[in-house]
Amino acid sequence: MVDVNKFESMQIGLASPDKIRSWSYGEVKKPETINYRTLKPEKDGLFDERIFGPTKDWECACGKYKRIRYKGVVCDRCGVEVTRSKVRRERMGHIELAAPVTHIWYFKGIPSRMGLVLDMSPRALEEIIYFASYVVLDPGNTPLEKKQLLSERDYRDKLLEYGSDAFKAEMGAEAIKKLLMSVDLDKEVTELKEELKEATGQKRTRAVRRLDILEAFVMSGNRPEWMVMDAIPVIPPDLRPMVQLEGGRFATSDLNDLYRRVINRNSRLKRLLDLNAPGIIVQNEKRMLQEAVDALIDNGRRGRPVAGPGNRPLKSLSHMLKGKQGRFRQNLLGKRVDYSGRSVIDVGPSLKFNQMGLPVPMALELFRPFIMKELVARGLASNIKNAKRQIDREDDDVFNVLEDVIKEHPVLLNRAPTLHRLGIQAFEPVLVSGKAMRLHPLACEAYNADFDGDQMAIHVPLSDEAQAEARLLMLAAHHILAPASGKPVVAPSQDMVIGNYYLTMEEANREGEGMIFTDLDEATLAYRNGIVHWHTRVGVQVTSMPDKPFTDEQRSKIMVTTVGKLIFNNILPKSFPYLNEPTSTNLNGYVPDKYFLEPGEDIHDYLQNAEIIPPFKKGFLSDIIAAVYQQYKVTATSELLDRIKDLGYNESTKSGLTVGMVDVTDLKEKPEIIAAAHKQVSTVTKQFRRGLITDHERYERVIGIWNDAKDEIQNALIHSFDQQNPIFMMSDSGARGNISNFTQLAGMRGLMAAPSGDIMELPITSNFREGLTVMEMFISTHGARKGMTDTALKTANSGYLTRRLVDVAQDVIIREKDCGTDRGLKIRAITDGNEMIEPLYDRILGRYTQKTVYDPQTGDVIVPKNQMIVEDTAQQIVDAGVEEVTIRSAFTCNTEHGVCEHCYGRNMATGDEVEVGEAVGTVAAQSIGEPGTQLTMRNFHTGGVAGNEDITQGLPRVQELFESRNPKGKAEITEVTGTVESIEENPAERTKEITIKGEADTRSYTLPITARMRVSEGDFIHRGGALNYGSVDPKELLRVRDVLSTETYILGEVQRVYRMQGVAISDKHVEIMVRQMLRKVRIMDPGDTDVLPGTLMDIQDFRRANYQTLIDGGIAATARPVILGITKAALETNSFLSAASFQETTRVLTDAAIRGKNDPLVGLKENVIIGKIIPAGTGMPDYRQIKPKEVGGTSTEGVYSISDLEKQMQEDSQA
């Protein structure tokens, strides 16, 4: 076998008949497979051992030579070479065809490659190939033309007219082969280039396409006649196996049936030719042979597919590659691995953050080789075989060894669906009883796991390098921040939140209020003796906390806090600010002076006037974690997380929080609010009946009335809730539920959606505490079912979006430190009217500046050029009132096949600068795809009042943007910069005419009368600006403006969708995706370069071609940028392996073979496919060259590799 790590690139091409024969180890002559009595392969059949190799290791077919010592001997009785049976997976055979056949991919694909080379229509080709018409090969001196089609009758007439020697016409693949052999590629190319100079329209397009294919043949060295085959390769038998089922029947791969049909028809054709059978019979047999080969290569591509038993179409060679179950996606991009297990997960509240609980039976199986090695090393077993027996017997020694073996040996846990890279993390195993794996409660968020029966898979990293990577890069402690936004992903939830919320609550007049303690210990003692409560407000001497960052003045005073807050602050790092209120001021290190008693001030008087401080909610806990991570990094944060978890669980238990019917309080004002709403509705109905308003307006108003009523009830509810109400506490703390849940429990359910998706006018005025009427219950069921189906559809849509995103960006890797670009991206906050979508702070944090940022008031430098903006400087920029910052961006990066460190900025998952080798493309795709399921699926109607455009939102809008489709509810854009001269309505045609006067010319645009205008008369508008509300088509924007404007527009629009749903994604992820959509240009005028007009080309390749031409003194080519949707962009990649494994496999491979494409293996997918280590992370060439330094002599005795152990086990068992 070839060592995959030795080659740099992989090429594909057309196989010539000689090549096919050179691959083959022998000709398959008979359709037989296996003898049903002896179960041995038949001679000359599809499983022949002489051709494909022995079925048993080191043993010939007849059994004369057995054992490895005869390696390489060819048996003189049966003719089988003694070797490993594995060769039956790699040795090919072939079938010599009695008549040539065409390859269906090249004749039937779109466009038909054969048709383009011969300049014939696919229909004409089909008639020739399937023996319906003759084609003139050589007209001689008759008036016929070469390549002219003749029907049977015409042919006979012409023979009578001109005689049989005057011209030559044939049919079938032979005729096509002769035509293809007669094509003079160089001459055709020259003629076409001449033709291109004059041709226009349809003719030009056809010429460009023909020239493209012909040049591909010239460049690749493929011959056109190789599209017709004289011999067919037979794939190795172990790739099309035949296995015996119980009851003596056989299950076989469909390919064997397809090969059998070919061999049968081929043998029959040979016999007919030998017998000199009549032409029509031979012709029919040749046609059947052609159809059999078509079915073998791509069943169902032409005509009806060949079916097997039960009318199921047979799977041909093409189907073996295509789709999710095909070779690419099923076996090459994702494989099943050994040393793995799967089990139900259970909660492990006592685990440390880096640990997981591993059931003993799983541990014994997963770590078996390590245990065996250790048993032998300690002398507890004499050899590997004995060690194996001990494990099977579960001896006591085994468990002692197991403890030591799993210590310091991380394992990987994965939960499907793995939507982002946090779906696989490393943990240190701890042995637990039972059969369920234990998962740390804080790891649930990243995995999106719960314990209602979820299962997880476990994998053991075997080699030292793999263990080191798992420990240093993948340990759960390194996954505290989400790669999508840089916000903590391991925030406490549910019980942990409610526990800390309860602990930090304040209550007035609790027992022991106003007591003053020296330190925490004294306060705890008082609590244990029942003198104070967690919620009691007390004083404490600041001197008891010397490490906390108080001001000098504060240190001499007494601080007012609660006992619970003292406990809470005790778990924070020693030098972290004392948290007394849930504000960012306090978090940033400053405890407000109002919490300190002035000298001589009485604490009881102070407390009379002091307001109650709200407790710490989920969001604030998250902020604390982020702040600790920023200051103290990984270790301190993971320790803090465990402490928050333990404290939360303890205190939530002590709080005794329960929920009962009593906690759902009735609302006194509800009947009045509902009565008022009914009254308004009847008024509106009256107006409609009198014809004052339209039905649509009535509907809109009724919906509005009920929504207002529901909001009023909701607000009244919030105010009526007692702060100590358990339901309110759950919602307020962020532990579970939100206000709308409680409105439905205690207020009213409100309006429901009908099956059509429209909102029904009948509101549900009851709540769940009162109970619903039968009618209300029935109305509710629509919404409930719709919710379920929407979720299911959304998951599929979102998963497919992620797959396309990953495919388009998988080769984007950080490849260098600095690309040295001189361009940058000007950014400001993204707003929608007065609504803030994404603030400037979020957009500039962790990015490099392209230009120096100055303070607009003082002119001082805030951040110099080419420096990263960190939290402090970002805040300074915002505080100084800077509105626009020019930053380095992926949009303007010059790095090929990736981005540089400076254009990318900070790695969101670590908070540090990104490193060379980081697979930022994949991370970006996951970050955008993972929240896809949280986006809505709805296309909102903005209701006739506001104009009739539909705004697509949620997931469909994201897809629309990334696929650069024509948007729904499109906005017209102006092509000139100038002033809006007039807006005239034309009621007759129901249109508006907008006239814009530019500097050079005046343009008019026609819009429907219902369009809501963004501009009014006298407004100044830049070209590319939208005239009405709606979505701009990026393709138009690119035509009118430039690449950067288009990129910026898509970025803003994608962010708008996600931020509206409350999902924070860093700009850089979207930038990487959008950049991939705009990396191609279409050649307009080739100048003196070799490129063809109209072809798509990578921007980098285009620059290179132009650079070379200019150096040689030629005229450069001109091109215009094109925007491709992500699907198209993924298929247009330079890697044919990546494209073929994505979609349209046959089309991609057909095209790649004709062009003799070379895959440079720069992306991740193509390397995974061929089994090479991926060129990202530690697989980057720079890291692979590092050699370990020898320190002292090391003994390699007694060191086993896993494969050594497996070999030893095999040999022991054979012995």
UniProtKB/Swiss-Prot annotation:
Keywords: DNA-directed RNA polymerase, Magnesium, Metal-binding, Nucleotidyltransferase, Transcription, Transferase, Zinc
Entry-linked InterPro entries: DNA-dir_RpoC_beta_prime (IPR045867), DNA-dir_RpoC_beta_prime_bact (IPR012754), RNA_pol_asu (IPR000722), RNA_pol_N (IPR006592), RNA_pol_Rpb1_1 (IPR007080), RNA_pol_Rpb1_3 (IPR007066), RNA_pol_Rpb1_3_sf (IPR042102), RNA_pol_Rpb1_4 (IPR007083)
Cofactors named for this entry: Mg(2+); Zn(2+)
Top-level taxonomic group: Bacteria
Residues annotated as binding Zn(2+) 2: 819, 893, 900, 903
Catalytic reactions of this protein: RNA(n) + a ribonucleoside 5'-triphosphate = RNA(n+1) + diphosphate
Keyword Magnesium found: yes
Record's cofactor remark: Binds 1 Mg(2+) ion per subunit.
Protein EC: 2.7.7.6
GO biological process terms, semicolon-separated: DNA-templated transcription
SUPFAM superfamilies, A to Z: beta and beta-prime subunits of DNA dependent RNA-polymerase
Statement: the UniProt record of this protein carries the keyword Oxidoreductase: no
HAMAP family: RNApol_bact_RpoC
Subunit architecture: The RNAP catalytic core consists of 2 alpha, 1 beta, 1 beta' and 1 omega subunit. When a sigma factor is associated with the core the holoenzyme is formed, which can initiate transcription.
Function text: DNA-dependent RNA polymerase catalyzes the transcription of DNA into RNA using the four ribonucleoside triphosphates as substrates.
PANTHER family according to UniProt: DNA-DIRECTED RNA POLYMERASE, DNA-DIRECTED RNA POLYMERASE SUBUNIT BETA
Designated name of the protein: DNA-directed RNA polymerase subunit beta'
Organism: Levilactobacillus brevis (strain ATCC 367 / BCRC 12310 / CIP 105137 / JCM 1170 / LMG 11437 / NCIMB 947 / NCTC 947) (Lactobacillus brevis)
Lineage, top ranks: Bacteria, Bacillati, Bacillota, Bacilli, Lactobacillales
